[in-house]
């Protein structure tokens, strides 16, 4: 069937990704940065579309996605702005893809309209916020000032985001995987909330033992006319 064929393609993609990532070694863990761990978790979670716009200290997540996603035939687009990237997320999510973006405080603020539209349309999406100091332009030092903004949703209307706050590089990976699970279970935006220190911190990461198969048909997704 087409579903099983798509599943086989995904498994080959993930196998190739892990072959590249492990540098042809059989080790089960490596020393990696938190930002890299996010992408590892996303790949295992079946993320097949990453749309984003670079901003310090989240830019490394885009760098890693731009490096690994094309290697295994997944979609990466550097948008022209934060507003464009969150609207690409909206479009990808509406067709059932596992979508993700990453940004920091000023960029997250620009995405708020997209957040509320995702919630209103009941679409799953994962947004990673690597927080930096504010208010305004602020600086690139680490801070936890985006907490109220992302927990309360940020955009207009009565809705909430699901928010996961990792405490280690391992949790940067594990909670990114969990974010995709929750986003698709509840059809709601999920934010992985960390700061610049955690994004730059390097710790041993144990790779996930199982991967998520993203080829399960979502009955609510827009598939186009046939």
Regions found by a protein language model. Give the residues of each.
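Structural beta-strand/beta-sheet cores of well-ordered domains, especially the beta-sheet scaffolds
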Residues: 51, 123, 162, 188-190, ...
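Short, well-ordered, mixed-charge alpha-helical segments that flank or form enzyme active sites
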Residues: 110, 134-137, 171-173, 198-203
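Thiamine diphosphate
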Residues: 21-153, 160, 177
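Conserved thiamine diphosphate
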Residues: 142-195
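Single conserved hydrophobic/aromatic residue that forms the stacking wall/gate
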Residues: 1-13
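Conformationally flexible catalytic loops at phosphate/diphosphate-handling active centers
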Residues: 187-226
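Short basic, glycine-rich beta-strand/loop surfaces that mediate nucleic-acid
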Residues: 120, 179, 206-208
């Amino acid at each position: 069937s087409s579903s099983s064929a798509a599943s086989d393609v995904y498994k080959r993609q993930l196998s190739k990704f892990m072959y590249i990532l492990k540098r042809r070694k059989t080790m089960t863990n490596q020393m990696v940065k938190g930002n890299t761990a996010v992408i590892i978790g996303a790949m295992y979670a079946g993320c097949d579309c990453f749309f984003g716009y670079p901003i310090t200290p989240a830019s490394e997540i885009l760098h890693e996605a731009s490096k690994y996603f094309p290697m295994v035939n997944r979609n990466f687009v550097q948008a022209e702005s934060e507003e464009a990237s969150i609207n690409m997320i909206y479009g990808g999510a509406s067709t059932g893809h596992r979508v993700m973006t990453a940004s920091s405080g000023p960029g997250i603020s620009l995405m708020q309209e997209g957040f509320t539209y995702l919630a209103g349309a009941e679409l799953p999406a994962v947004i990673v916020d690597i927080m930096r100091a504010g208010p305004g332009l602020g600086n690139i030092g680490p801070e936890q000032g985006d907490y109220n903004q992302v927990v309360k949703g940020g955009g207009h209307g009565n809705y909430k985001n699901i928010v996961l706050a990792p405490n280690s590089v391992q949790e940067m990976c594990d909670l990114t995987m969990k974010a995709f699970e929750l986003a698709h279970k509840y059809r709601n935006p999920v934010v992985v909330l960390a700061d610049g220190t955690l994004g730059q911190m390097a710790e041993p990461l144990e790779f996930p033992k199982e991967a998520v198969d993203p080829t399960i048909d979502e009955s609510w997704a827009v598939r186009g006319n046939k």
